[in-house]
Amino acid sequence: MFTLRELPFAKDSMGDFLSPVAFDFHHGKHHQTYVNNLNNLIKGTDFEKSSLFAILTKSSGGVFNNAAQIYNHDFYWDCLSPKATALSDELKEALEKDFGSLEKFKEDFIKSATTLFGSGWNWAAYNLDTQKIEIIQTSNAQTPVTDKKVPLLVVDVWEHAYYIDHKNARPVYLEKFYGHVNWHFVSQCYEWAKKEGLGSVDYYINELVHKKA
């Protein structure tokens, strides 16, 4: 069965971006619920002994929705950092090439996240076919992985991600999010996306050790 991963940072380390109470609900309640739901849905099925990556790429309906939400949240937590981190020269060059400048990437990313209608996720992902970085909106539980694109960065724009601290001010939440991006992690994702493609997603998920022995 699957278990809830621990946060990779202290709940009180994000300043005025997100509060410990927000993490108590978002991680401790919402994320935990997706784990519980998936365990209940796969019990006694062919997916019961499958990896999260296998479920994510081979399932549909409620099983997919809950598996995807587990992965999406896992990835979101790793995209956050209490303090600013530097992006690699390789990623910097790629963003400048694909978007014109780092400032333009930020502008496009925040605009995309702001205008995403309803609940969902806003991503930067590596397109294995074009070998370029794209900004992608996904609704509800959808993820670029199912379109064979490798996630590099994500922000959660479900209301439960920001309502406790920022009410309906999604743009304020997004601006503060950008000041807490773990660019070291994003840079690693880009490096491995170019080397291993979707295999890097499978490796990342397995490294989280969701499964009980």
UniProtKB/Swiss-Prot annotation:
Binds 1 Fe cation per subunit. Its cofactor is Fe cation. One of its GO terms (molecular function) is metal ion binding. It is an enzyme of class 1 (oxidoreductase). Fe cation binds at H26, H73, D156, H160. Its EC number is 1.15.1.1. InterPro entries: Mn/Fe_SOD, Mn/Fe_SOD_BS, Mn/Fe_SOD_C, Mn/Fe_SOD_N, Mn/Fe_SOD_N_sf, SOD_C_sf. Keywords: Iron, Metal-binding, Oxidoreductase. Destroys superoxide anion radicals which are normally produced within the cells and which are toxic to biological systems. This is Superoxide dismutase [Fe]. It comes from Helicobacter pylori (strain J99 / ATCC 700824). The lineage of its organism: Bacteria, Pseudomonadati, Campylobacterota, Epsilonproteobacteria, Campylobacterales.
